[in-house]
Regions:
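Signature of N-terminal electron-transfer/Fe-S-associated modules in redox systems
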Residues: 1-164
Length: 164
């Protein structure tokens, strides 16, 4: 039997009727049409479905939608826009951190969590943070470079904002 669940996704509050066993990833994709969150394995192995819940990267295939009620959720669609990319999106583009792009939303969301808690990570810290995200195309070198570059872009932006 479906029940109403109120989710705050990318700053917008919405109520949807879902089965209590519905996974957040399916609600995001099928009910809210936020298809940037990918389903790669449905077993919490690949990281393609990663979103930010209450400030932390979470694999949305491991969370019931009802568990996310009342917590802010950010998906890749909430990270930037076509006209104003988020620094992580910009860095992935500039540093060629994607090929097919399937893993990219999850990588960016995981990197966002890392950079929100550690604004100047080492290469080792970046690699450790991304351990739960799989990429079959790039070999991770450009992804790590993109995260490192994004960190510098974010720090530069913060400095510029402090001077304004």
């Amino acid at each position: 039997m479906k029940r109403p669940v109120t989710l705050t996704v990318n700053g917008a509050r919405t109520t949807v009727e879902v089965e209590p066993r519905a996974l957040l990833v399916h609600v995001l994709r099928d009910e809210l049409n936020l298809t940037g969150t990918h389903i790669g394995c449905d077993t919490s192995q690949c990281g393609a479905c990663t979103v930010i819940i209450d400030g932390y990267a979470v694999k949305s295939c491991t969370v019931l939608a009802v568990q996310a009620e009342g917590q802010p959720i950010t998906t890749i669609e909430g990270m930037g826009s076509v006209d104003a990319l988020h620094p992580l999106q910009q860095a992935f583009w500039e540093k060629h951190g994607l090929q097919c792009g399937f893993c990219t939303p999850g990588m960016i969301m995981t990197a966002s969590d890392l950079l929100s808690h550690n604004p100047d990570p080492s290469e080792e810290e970046i690699r450790h943070a991304l351990e739960g995200n799989y990429c079959r195309c790039t070999g991770y070198v450009n992804i790590v470079a993109a995260v490192k570059h994004a960190a510098s872009l974010i720090r530069e932006g913060a400095r510029a904002g402090a001077l304004a």
